[in-house]
């Protein structure tokens, strides 16, 4: 399988923050929490100093980037509904246990 036929790219943040609508808190080690209320460009950005982040865009999109491993633990039911296309790219091994 050629990955170029199934490729996609990480969306780029359309950062249009304007004073005084952007509130940023940065900790001493570099963690960031940002609330941007710039009209038409509202977004929320939460970042760890290691580069992992979650960002919500003005149009409702959300990007989550994790620089190492990710674990999701659901103690009861889990439901996933995708109204459009679902594209999963695994560049390595994949295992599913049922």
Segments predicted by a language model, with ranges:
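Structural signature for extended repeat/solenoid scaffolds and their inter-repeat hinge/linker regions
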Residues: 1-98
